[in-house]
From Swiss-Prot:
<feature type="disulfide bond">
    <location>
        <begin position="297"/>
        <end position="321"/>
    </location>
</feature>
<feature type="topological domain" description="Extracellular">
    <location>
        <begin position="17"/>
        <end position="530"/>
    </location>
</feature>
<feature type="disulfide bond">
    <location>
        <begin position="68"/>
        <end position="293"/>
    </location>
</feature>
<keyword id="KW-0564">Palmitate</keyword>
<comment type="function">
    <text>Binds to sialic acid-containing receptors on the cell surface, bringing about the attachment of the virus particle to the cell. This attachment induces virion internalization of about two third of the virus particles through clathrin-dependent endocytosis and about one third through a clathrin- and caveolin-independent pathway. Plays a major role in the determination of host range restriction and virulence. Class I viral fusion protein.</text>
</comment>
<dbReference type="GO" id="GO:0075512">
    <property type="term" value="P:clathrin-dependent endocytosis of virus by host cell"/>
</dbReference>
<keyword id="KW-0946">Virion</keyword>
<feature type="glycosylation site" description="N-linked (GlcNAc...) asparagine; by host">
    <location>
        <position position="301"/>
    </location>
</feature>
<keyword id="KW-1160">Virus entry into host cell</keyword>
<dbReference type="GO" id="GO:0016020">
    <property type="term" value="C:membrane"/>
</dbReference>
<feature type="lipid moiety-binding region" description="S-palmitoyl cysteine; by host">
    <location>
        <position position="565"/>
    </location>
</feature>
<feature type="glycosylation site" description="N-linked (GlcNAc...) asparagine; by host">
    <location>
        <position position="54"/>
    </location>
</feature>
<dbReference type="InterPro" id="IPR013828">
    <property type="entry name" value="Hemagglutn_HA1_a/b_dom_sf"/>
</dbReference>
<keyword id="KW-1043">Host membrane</keyword>
<feature type="glycosylation site" description="N-linked (GlcNAc...) asparagine; by host">
    <location>
        <position position="181"/>
    </location>
</feature>
<keyword id="KW-1162">Viral penetration into host cytoplasm</keyword>
<dbReference type="GO" id="GO:0039654">
    <property type="term" value="P:fusion of virus membrane with host endosome membrane"/>
</dbReference>
Amino acid sequence: MKTVIALSYILCLTFGQDLPGNDNSTATLCLGHHAVPNGTIVKTITDDQIEVTNATELVQSSSTGKICNNPHRILDGRACTLIDALLGDPHCDVFQNETWDLFVERSNAFSNCYPYDIPDYASLRSLVASSGTLEFITEGFTWTGVTQNGGSSACKRGPANGFFSRLNWLTKSESAYPVLNVTMPNNDNFDKLYIWGVHHPSTNQEQTNLYVQASGRVTVSTRRSQQTIIPNIGSRPWVRGQPGRISIYWTIVKPGDVLVINSNGNLIAPRGYFKMRTGKSSIMRSDAPIDTCISECITPNGSIPNDKPFQNVNKITYGACPKYVKQNTLKLATGMRNVPEKQTRGLFGAIAGFIENGWEGMIDGWYGFRHQNSEGTGQAADLKSTQAAIDQINRKLNRVIEKTNEKFHQIEKEFSEVEGRIQDLEKYVEDTKIDLWSYNAELLVALENQHTIDLADSEMNKLFEKTRRQLRENAEDMGNGCFKIYHKCDNACIESIRNGTYDHDIYRDEALNNRFQIKGVELKSGYKDWILWISFAISCLLLCVVLLGFIMWACQRGNIRCNICI
């Protein structure tokens, strides 16, 4: 029994002694990446829910609630529509010769002159809006044998009866209304817009009282077009005390062309022309207030920032705006895959690298080093690899924004009732475009997220391989993102590994010597178990030998008798 105890004691001393390499002749260096306690969930091509350390929202879902007047010139229509300002409604005289980038029509706008209709209202409104100006030049039309400057009680200009300032209502003179034939050439180098009209009396009596003839006719032509309008006499619902109507028409005269007006009654003549300009001006219906601020993108809800590639505030936009999509949120990964640190591990109680988990303590970089040596423990970020990853992700975000921000505007579209099928088709096309863009946006973000995560992992692997190439045979890969360095490596040595100036030849002999010594006697976790089992088996064997020897000795002395029966 004393022999067994003695052998067990010897084995314990053997396996419990300090091993070579447990002293200050080695060090441990781990590589890791940033982690946060609670990451952000994003979508990738392969995974609908993957956690990353950081993500940027790509969808602008709110407006400022006000329209910024810079850098775009905003013209507030207040109580006037653009067409009323164009025609010269008395309460819209303040808009004469105005210019704009965006004309804002309000919901409380109203007409306050003779009731009218425009058969092609939407086209005229869009044409004038895109021109961006109400610059008007009066021309010397000669209307012989008729009375000019007709007025109406429905169109007061002060206390007196008035009319649209840009139109000239012609009526009979001394019971006569001769046939009018007037020409006006365009000798300038720009397009001219002429606005004219036809009066529709409510009764035959009113027709003859104003124009003598029982039925008038108006023909306006150029070399490229001709319009002939016959008045429709008949009573209509009373508007501002008038049962009659005026139909407004328009003609564009190109440079070198000529305008010809022929009529024997019912003509609402032009007083001149509007100078047409080419540009990207527009019009928008909105009740948002106009404020002094700066914004490139305007919607009916108000201005919105254009630092995001997508928005779901409004389909109608003006300026350099994010693309409209249906989604309320699309998150672009701007950080790496998040693997929260195991809190039970402790900082260096069992130091581990990026293969096991991330590090939550790194605030100055995405990638870094942790070490454990004779001088203690430490941590430092690797700024070069961090900056390389950040630069690529920032370029990616800027490319997405640049590709999707529109440098034009999505205008409002209006259709008359007879164009209902066209309106339905237009709506279908717009809805289809939005569906496609929404799908493309989600796919684009998922692809970019996948690439970002792969990129971040790649930078981590590059840093690990760079460190491995530096250390060579002086260290061993521990399989968890760490290296066991087989030579004394103080803080200066660790720093040289981090900054790429480490010279493995200096430490080569020491590392090889320590590696052989440690490998000769080092007990790794797997071998310790085997040796413990072997020592236990030897102890049991020795115990059995001693017990068997005791039995044989006792039998020889006669103290024990053994009977074998067959």
